[in-house]
Amino acid sequence: MKDAFVIYRYPSAGNKCVIVKQDESSLKKLHSFSELGKADGFVFAPFCITEDTPAVLFDSPIRRVTELDYDNILREVMYNGNCCVLNERLKPYNGKLYDRKSYEEDFNCFKAAIREKRIDKAVLSRSLVLKDDNKKNVIRMFLKACENNSDSYIVLISSDQTGVWLVATPEVLLERCGNVFHTIALAGTMDKRLVISDNESKAIGKISDIDISCWSNKNIWEQQ
């Protein structure tokens, strides 16, 4: 029997995190978000759910709250001595390393496409391969992410079905207050501290009593 787990820290939650641990065989594969129904748990999903890449539901009712401490977290994760995936050695990486030259070539392709008006916007990312065969070190990486990003939602996921993922995001995709749902777009990163006048709000559009007069048209458009 092998355990999978999720560890997450809410924004501004101080020194506390939540651990959800579940037997690997009891994780639920979802091939559509409609399968969630009234399920209660942690959902890890790809951008596009397919037969080969389903969403995975951690629905264990046991959720332990513990302090952000390496020994405490490791003790909770290894609780009952189940064969946790963190006990295993990482497999050697045989893929292609994404070097600086490859990144520059991709960047130039993106830049040319934007200049030629073939696309309006592009996001270029890269991967970084760390040479470390001890999976337990990802817990230290999780703690470091919590320390460096106090206002972000930090998650560490580990299971055979998903692999090992460390996530950090300041973005609230969707929150509910009663029957009201609220979503946030991060496209506008301008200073939002000033309140605009009624005349200005009529001219450029009012968004939650914040000053958007200094925003670019791009940011105003993306925040609609």
What are these regions (language model features)?
Residues 1-35, 130-133:
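Short Lys/Arg-enriched alpha/beta "domain-start" segment
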Residues 47, 126-128, 157-161, 168-170, ...:
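Short, structured patches in soluble enzyme cores that scaffold and shape functional sites
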Residues 51-55, 66-68, 132-133, 167, ...:
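Short helix/loop capping segments that flank catalytic or ligand/cofactor-binding pockets
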Residues 24-130, 178, 215, 219-221:
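Non-catalytic accessory segments adjacent to catalytic cores
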Residues 134-177, 181:
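SIR2/sirtuin-family catalytic core signature
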Residues 3-11, 120-122, 152-157:
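A short, Trp-centered hydrophobic/proline-enriched beta-strand micro-motif
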Residues 37-39, 175-224:
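Cytosolic ligand/metal-binding cores
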Residues 8-15, 45-51, 157-161:
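Short, flexible beta-strand-to-coil junctions
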